[in-house]
């Protein structure tokens, strides 16, 4: 099985446990997984250890327990991670966390997006843009803002799986293609 299928299956299993426990636990499990995933992202040597077949499941569990102490993980998430260690699935924790977060967003009606501009936007302007987009989408929006001078001007908006590229760079690229085709 590929990591994607595996991670979705484990995320779905933990998610169903969280749904039975209630919305508070559902969010807490997601937070703990996100924290653990961030620790692994910041510590690639721990992730390499989890991938290394030379180390036993018990050795990996010992390292995992130390990492879990740095998170808000409760007993359910700790047991879940122990199961992952037993099954040799610790390397897919970041993907499981991502899949779990997507499921949680879906249940809570949250859409994630990213807005890239050529200049830094003020906090007031960011709030205005976010509010207008939420009104248009008719759902709660978690919007990340980024700056990229390479787009020259305009905006690149990604919401969910849709991308709107209204940057000057994209417009210049389209003009270039039209000139090449002789239009």
Swiss-Prot record:
What Gene Ontology terms describe what this protein does at the molecular function level? proton-transporting ATP synthase activity, rotational mechanism
GO CC annotations? plasma membrane; proton-transporting ATP synthase complex
Q: Where found in the cell?
A: Cell inner membrane
Q: Which UniProt keywords apply?
A: ATP synthesis, Cell inner membrane, Cell membrane, CF(1), Hydrogen ion transport, Ion transport, Membrane, Transport
Q: How does it sit in the membrane?
A: Peripheral membrane protein
Q: Which domain of life is it from?
A: Bacteria
Q: Chief location of this protein?
A: membrane
Return the InterPro entries for the record.
ATP_synth_OSCP/delta_N_sf, ATPase_OSCP/d_CS, ATPase_OSCP/dsu
Q: Which Pfam families match?
A: OSCP
Oligomeric state and interaction partners are given as: F-type ATPases have 2 components, F(1) - the catalytic core - and F(0) - the membrane proton channel. F(1) has five subunits: alpha(3), beta(3), gamma(1), delta(1), epsilon(1). F(0) has three main subunits: a(1), b(2) and c(10-14). The alpha and beta chains form an alternating ring which encloses part of the gamma chain. F(1) is attached to F(0) by a central stalk formed by the gamma and epsilon chains, while a peripheral stalk is formed by the delta and b chains.
Please describe what this protein does. F(1)F(0) ATP synthase produces ATP from ADP in the presence of a proton or sodium gradient. F-type ATPases consist of two structural domains, F(1) containing the extramembraneous catalytic core and F(0) containing the membrane proton channel, linked together by a central stalk and a peripheral stalk. During catalysis, ATP synthesis in the catalytic domain of F(1) is coupled via a rotary mechanism of the central stalk subunits to proton translocation. This protein is part of the stalk that links CF(0) to CF(1). It either transmits conformational changes from CF(0) to CF(1) or is implicated in proton conduction.
Which HAMAP family would you find in this protein's record?
ATP_synth_delta_bact (MF_01416)
Similarity field = Belongs to the ATPase delta chain family.
**Know the name of this protein?**
ATP synthase subunit delta
Query: Which organism does this record belong to?
Result: Maridesulfovibrio salexigens (strain ATCC 14822 / DSM 2638 / NCIMB 8403 / VKM B-1763) (Desulfovibrio salexigens)
Q: What is the lineage of its organism?
A: Bacteria, Pseudomonadati, Thermodesulfobacteriota, Desulfovibrionia, Desulfovibrionales
User: What gene is this protein translated from?
Assistant: atpH
């Amino acid at each position: 099985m590929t990591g994607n299928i595996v991670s979705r299956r484990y995320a779905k299993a933990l998610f169903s446990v969280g749904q039975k426990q209630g919305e508070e636990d559902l969010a807490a499990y997601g937070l703990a997984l996100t924290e653990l995933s961030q620790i692994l992202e910041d510590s690639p040597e721990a992730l390499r250890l989890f991938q290394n077949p030379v180390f036993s499941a018990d050795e990996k569990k010992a390292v995992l327990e130390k990492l879990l102490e740095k998170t808000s993980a409760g007993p359910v998430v700790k047991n879940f991670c122990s199961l992952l260690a037993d099954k040799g699935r610790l390397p897919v924790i970041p993907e499981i966390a991502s899949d779990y977060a997507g499921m949680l967003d879906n249940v809570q009606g949250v859409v994630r997006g990213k807005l890239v501009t050529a200049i830094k936007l003020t906090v007031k302007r960011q709030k205005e843009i976010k509010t207008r987009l939420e009104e248009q989408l008719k759902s709660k929006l978690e919007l990340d803002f980024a700056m990229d001078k390479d787009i020259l001007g305009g905006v690149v908006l990604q919401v969910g799986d849709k991308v709107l590229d209204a940057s000057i760079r994209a417009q210049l690229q389209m003009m270039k293609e039209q000139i090449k085709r002789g239009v």
